[in-house]
Amino acid sequence: MNRIHAVILDWAGTTVDFGSFAPTQIFVEAFRQAFDVEITLAEARVPMGLGKWQHIEALGKLPAVDARWQAKFGRAMSAADIDAIYAAFMPLQIAKVVDFSSPIAGVIDTIATLRAEGIKIGSCSGYPRAVMERLVPAAAGHGYCPDHWVATDDLAAGGRPGPWMALQNVIALGIDAVAHCVKVDDAAPGISEGLNAGMWTVGLAVSGNEFGATWDAYQTMSKEDVAVRREHAASKLYAAGAHYVVDSLADLPGVIAHINARLAQGERP
């Protein structure tokens, strides 16, 4: 059948952890713990979607963070420094990720709708396996259990923005064509991952990292503030090449219906 056979879903900010707060807060704590260097939550969000070692490396290259680092140590951040921050990050993230394992509103119903249509549920994450081994069973306890998952350090080729985690899902799920897959993510590296894998891509503008609000804050936010944040997030996701941008995973079934119509007309990603 010339239709969508699988979706490949990100985790934090896409299916669990509205606003993607688990990783961002831990980066701030890890920099402070390892080197007594302060970074802001906004800075911690900038490279979101990359593997966590690569995320720390990218943070060290942000001009403001690099300036603070140079002022304190008289040199740029080194690979050994990144290793030290990562060593601080990992136990903090492993300990706290279960506190951010609840599915985002609409996720459970959306997964049920997709499965009723015969669509398989793949997933991948910028989290390493040690973190995913805590997160996956915790999310399952809340009712979210994808058919497959891949961690950022599982594959020798690497993680995002490369296509490998998405393609590993294709193999594991037995999907016959990447054009029959949709990659869904709330951050630009995950959109690039899907494009590099030859898939349709859907960005999430409200539930994730770029919007950057807790569920409670979002619920009490003015329509004007929501619109401004949504536009900011959507512009970044479209700039990354997303075929579609919607608010959250709850909007995905409608997008898939649209993609199926395009596939039936012979279109490809």
Swiss-Prot record:
Biological process annotations from GO: DNA repair; organic phosphonate catabolic process
Keywords attached to this entry: Hydrolase, Magnesium, Metal-binding, Schiff base
Catalysed conversion reaction: phosphonoacetaldehyde + H2O = acetaldehyde + phosphate + H(+)
UniProt cofactor(s): Mg(2+)
Keyword Transmembrane helix: no
The record's free-text note on cofactor binding: Binds 1 Mg(2+) ion per subunit.
Active-site positions on this chain: 10, 52
Residues bound to Mg(2+): 10, 12, 186
Enzyme Commission number(s) from the entry: 3.11.1.1
SUPFAM superfamilies: HAD-like (SSF56784)
Top-level taxonomic group: Bacteria
Keyword Metal-binding: yes
Pfam families in the cross-refs: Hydrolase
GO MF annotations, alphabetized: magnesium ion binding; phosphoglycolate phosphatase activity; phosphonoacetaldehyde hydrolase activity
Cellular component, GO annotation: cytosol
UniProt family annotation: Belongs to the HAD-like hydrolase superfamily. PhnX family.
Function in brief: Involved in phosphonate degradation.
Subunit field text: Homodimer.
Protein name: Phosphonoacetaldehyde hydrolase
Species, as recorded: Salmonella paratyphi A (strain AKU_12601)
Gene: phnX
